[in-house]
UniProtKB/Swiss-Prot annotation:
Pfam families hit by this protein: tRNA-synt_1e (PF01406)
UniProt feature coiled coil, ranges: none
The protein's name in its UniProt record: L-cysteine:1D-myo-inositol 2-amino-2-deoxy-alpha-D-glucopyranoside ligase
Known cofactor(s): Zn(2+)
Subunit structure: Monomer.
Entry EC no(s): 6.3.1.13
Family: Belongs to the class-I aminoacyl-tRNA synthetase family. MshC subfamily.
Residues given in the record as Zn(2+) binding sites: 44, 232, 257
Name of the gene: mshC
Species, as recorded: Corynebacterium aurimucosum (strain ATCC 700975 / DSM 44827 / CIP 107346 / CN-1) (Corynebacterium nigricans)
Cofactor remark: Binds 1 zinc ion per subunit.
């Protein structure tokens, strides 16, 4: 599947700072330990049944920042992202709206691409729909069955395939949740704990046997379609290797999705840990309530842009809070971001001396290197802008250095 164009950035003068990120599995901020010249990153993509809202955008903007810091540190980045283009929410929305689910998916994927391009988000090199990956998914299901890590339920009508939570010794290491928490989230987030025939209520579906009216693909274990978690296990490891650097997504994916994606890959491939760092973003709310398709309290990226909002202001609004924290979006947040963008642009015309700007850039780098502290980076630039608007001197070279740094590191165009 085609992604979207790569935004143009230039190299930033000065010395980059090594990136440190909070790892959900280890529960601490730690320096990325990247071996070789290429960093590998997998971020879970959308289920394409509605437009890109700011909750989605905040997640992809976070991993865009990570991508930019990796580039600044001299790494190449091998980035993969899936699209869950065959799943129940897509079927349900298509039925509600009286459209073909494939057409609905295609239209929303196209809109997602457009939104990501507008926001200057670096695209994945591997942008893969579940339907494109059926063969590799069935291979992983078969590997789990062969290893005794999965089983077929005793149901002649619907012989679904499940992965056992006992297949790996370290199940639970990624989320660090208690059994009680797992059971709660599993039931709330697409699990089926009461499915008859399962060995454990937490065992996860990896192949859903064909039901009338649903799409199906042939497999060695009968016609059907893939489960949600194993889709990412297969897509990620087939493109990034059995163990890669960063697995990312929203905090609501920590369990069950990321826990099971890791467990399936580890059991099938015989590795101890699928990702070296599990990075999760906080939820974006509107008036105190998490943005959610089911609740309908959404702010859409394309509608903001159609209303004349500068995409750089959207980025600054999202970055005004720390990526790991749950936070609110509001008209006030957007208004503040728009005013900030205008101040920075005005200040960039008379920014100060080259040496002063290099010090500003150095401090922005330090902030972003420490678990993407965008609030601190913004504060550094706010302080610079205040001084520059006071009595700074004009310097075309300094302006170029500043604009290059802010665009390359933050994706904000001055």
């Amino acid at each position: 599947m085609q992604s979207w164009p790569v935004p143009h950035i230039d190299s930033v003068p000065g010395t980059p700072s090594p990136l440190h990120l909070y790892d959900s599995a280890d529960g601490e901020v730690k320096r990325l330990n990247i071996k070789g010249e290429t960093a590998t990153m997998y971020v879970c993509g959308i289920t394409p049944y509605d437009s890109t809202h700011l909750g989605h955008a905040a997640t992809y903007l976070t991993f865009d920042l990570i991508y930019r810091q990796l580039l600044d540190n001299g790494y190449k980045v091998n980035y993969a992202q899936n699209i869950t283009d065959v799943d129940d929410p897509l079927f349900e929305r298509a039925e509600r709206d009286g459209v073909d689910w494939r057409e609905l998916g295609t239209s929303q994927i196209n809109l997602f691409r457009s939104d990501m391009e507008l926001l200057s988000v670096f695209p994945p090199q591997h942008f893969v729909g579940a339907m494109e990956a059926i063969d590799e998914i069935t291979e992983m299901v078969q590997a789990l069955l062969d290893a005794g890590a999965a089983y077929v339920v005793d149901d002649p009508d619907y012989p679904d395939v499940y992965a056992s939570i006992e297949a790996t010794k370290n199940f639970g290491y990624e989320s660090n949740y208690s059994r009680e928490q797992m059971e709660t989230f599993f039931a709330e987030r697409g699990g089926d704990p009461e499915r008859p025939g399962k060995r454990d209520p937490l065992d996860a579906l990896i192949w859903r046997a064909h039901r009338e009216g649903e799409p199906a693909w042939e497999s060695p274990f009968g016609p059907g379609r893939p489960g949600w978690h194993i889709e990412c296990s297969a897509i990620a490891t087939n493109r990034l290797g059995s163990s890669f650097d960063i697995q990312g997504g929203g905090s609501d994916l920590k369990f069950p999705h990321h826990e099971f994606s890791a467990a399936h890959a580890e059991a099938a491939l015989g590795v101890e840990r699928m990702a070296q760092s599990y990075v999760h973003t906080g939820m974006i709310g509107l008036e105190g309530t998490k943005m959610s398709k089911s609740l309908g309290n959404l702010v859409f990226v394309h509608k903001l842009v159609e209303a004349g909002v500068d995409p750089s202001a959207i980025r600054l609004g999202v970055f005004s809070g720390h990526y790991r924290e749950d936070r609110d979006w509001s008209d006030e947040v957007l208004h503040t971001a728009q005013e900030r963008l205008e101040r920075w642009r005005a200040a960039s015309r008379n920014p100060g001396t080259v040496e002063e700007i290099k010090e500003v850039v150095h401090n922005v780098r330090l902030a972003l290197a420490e678990d993407l502290d965008t609030q601190r980076a913004i504060a550094v630039l706010d302080q610079w802008a205040e001084q520059a608007l006071g009595a700074a001197e004009a310097s075309e070279e300094a302006s170029d250095v500043l604009r290059t740094a802010v665009n390359s590191l933050l994706g904000v165009r001055l």
